[in-house]
């Protein structure tokens, strides 16, 4: 692609040595990935400033550079822009030929429920005869090929590459607040956008819950001409978003328990795998929700309303739900020889953990046991509220480690001790090794116990633990098949 085509729609200051016909063979924002013929985009990142690596990029073969800082005297053309992140995303879209235009694009955002809603959508859409790609937290799935995810919302180059590679009719994207704030979805427009809910999360990144909401709501400004918004009204932030979009040209539909919702939940007939009664238009029908818990009632309703707007009847979609097999790392249940139930779940917010407890209570759990870990360099402000919640509900709370992310282990253990003393009245057990914490709960489990292991879901461990496993699920499977007690 020639330079002027790549810069189309991007405001830059063009240098004297600008060549509109300069052929660009690739784009990179990592100087180490540059090959001759590439353009380098210098981004002021969170851990390093890309402008420091311009010389390295040129040495590796970059033939042009885009950045924010005023820089002179380079041997290649340098284009200054006000926002190099936005420029990167727009150039990526230009480079790959605006691939979002060839797909029906569905964006899913919210604190909780993005992944489950995306998997539900993919299943229903594919069972209805359409092909579907997915970009999200667990995996990226393109043309039926599974690619392990690095982030919920990938960087702009990866997103546009995946969209260009996809031959599927529909693409579902989980859209994180980080992805929106960091301009990763710039240049992408959606046919459908879904808002699941909002809760206290990522407040180490966003200055307040209001700022977090405002970032999330920016997804709904990225709609195609006849775009449709699907909003959960049972959450106060969903109602605020509905009000915010009232004067927009797009169609806005809600699901919840209000009489004015497009899809209204009338009642829940059973609890664990809920059978629900739903009103849509003038008709009502019973629907079997394929996943446990009230939170999955809302996830299912959001998926059903979206596919209905795509032309798939609620009756047909509900029929397809019967063959849904679940989501990796989302409320995956495992039986214990003594009759206990172990659950691996990604839950890492108060709301998500409360949903887990509600399900256990509805199933008459005799005891709730929780193995809870926190990650280094993550939102520490929410930890005290989560520990307080867990200690109030659980018969046994075990505090353990999640990913350290460069924080010294001793410092994280001290943090667990402090949380235990201040917000759990010293009642929690502290077992830093995550696998040994799970083994401890496994060895002590009794009939009627519900044991939750939260925070990582399907994710692999980033450091080594005592047991020879790499995920929470593998740890449980190891303990189920171990013929002899595992040494401490």
How should these model regions be labeled?
Residues 1-90, 236, 264-267, 286, ...:
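N-terminal leader/targeting and accessory segments in enzymes
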Residues 63, 191, 395:
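Receiver (REC) domain switch/active-site residues of two-component response regulators
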Residues 1-12, 36-39, 305-315, 319-326, ...:
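ATP-dependent carboxylate-amine ligase
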Residues 9-10, 88-233, 237-250, 301-304, ...:
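Phosphate-binding loop of NTP-binding sites
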Residues 134, 173, 193, 231, ...:
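Structural beta-sheet core signal
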Residues 67-70, 175, 197, 233, ...:
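Short secondary-structure boundary segments
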């Amino acid at each position: 692609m020639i330079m002027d085509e790549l810069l189309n729609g991007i405001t830059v200051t063009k240098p004297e040595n600008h060549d509109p016909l300069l052929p660009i063979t690739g784009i990179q924002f990592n100087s180490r990935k540059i090959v001759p013929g590439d353009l380098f985009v210098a981004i002021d990142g969170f851990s390093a400033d890309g402008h420091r690596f311009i010389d390295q990029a040129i040495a590796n073969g970059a033939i042009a550079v885009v950045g924010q800082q005023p820089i002179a005297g380079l041997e290649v053309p340098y284009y200054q822009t006000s926002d190099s992140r936005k420029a990167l995303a727009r150039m990526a879209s230009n480079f790959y030929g605006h691939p979002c235009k060839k797909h029906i694009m569905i964006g899913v955002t919210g604190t909780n429920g993005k992944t489950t809603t995306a998997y539900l959508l993919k299943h229903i859409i594919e069972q209805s005869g359409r092909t579907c790609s997915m970009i999200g937290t667990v995996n990226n799935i393109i043309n039926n090929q599974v690619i392990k995810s690095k982030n919920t919302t990938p960087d702009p180059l990866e997103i546009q590459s995946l969209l260009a590679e996809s031959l599927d009719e529909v693409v579902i994207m989980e859209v994180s607040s980080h992805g929106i704030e960091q301009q990763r979805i710039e240049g992408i427009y959606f046919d459908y956008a879904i808002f699941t809910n909002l809760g206290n999360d990522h407040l180490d990144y966003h200055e307040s819950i209001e700022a977090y909401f405002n970032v999330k709501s920016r997804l709904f400004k990225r709609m195609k001409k006849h775009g449709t918004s699907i909003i959960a009204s049972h959450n106060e932030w969903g109602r605020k978003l509905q009000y915010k979009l009232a004067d927009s040209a797009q169609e806005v539909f809600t699901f919840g328990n209000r009489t004015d919702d497009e899809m209204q939940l009338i009642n829940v007939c059973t609890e664990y795998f809920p059978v629900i009664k739903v009103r849509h238009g003038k008709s009502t029908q019973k629907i079997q929700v394929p996943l446990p818990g009230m939170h999955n009632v809302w996830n299912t309703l959001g998926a059903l309303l979206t596919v209905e707007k795509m032309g798939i009847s609620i009756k047909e979609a509900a029929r397809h739900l019967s063959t849904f097999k679940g989501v990796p790392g989302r409320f995956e249940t495992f039986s214990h020889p003594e009759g206990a139930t172990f659950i691996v779940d990604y839950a890492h917010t108060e709301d998500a953990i409360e949903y887990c407890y509600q399900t256990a209570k509805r199933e008459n759990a005799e005891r709730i046991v929780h193995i809870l870990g926190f990650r280094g360099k993550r939102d520490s402000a929410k930890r005290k509220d989560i520990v307080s919640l867990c200690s109030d509900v659980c018969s046994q709370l075990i505090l353990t480690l999640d990913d350290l992310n460069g924080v010294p282990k001793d410092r994280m253990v001290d943090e667990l001790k402090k949380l235990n003393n201040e917000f759990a009245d010293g009642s929690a057990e502290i077992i830093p090794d995550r696998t040994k914490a799970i083994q401890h709960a496994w060895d002590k489990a009794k009939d009627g116990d519900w044991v939750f292991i939260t925070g990582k879901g399907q994710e692999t461990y980033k450091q080594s633990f005592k047991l020879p496993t790499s995920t929470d699920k593998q740890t449980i499977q190891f303990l189920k098949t171990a013929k002899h007690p595992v040494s401490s």
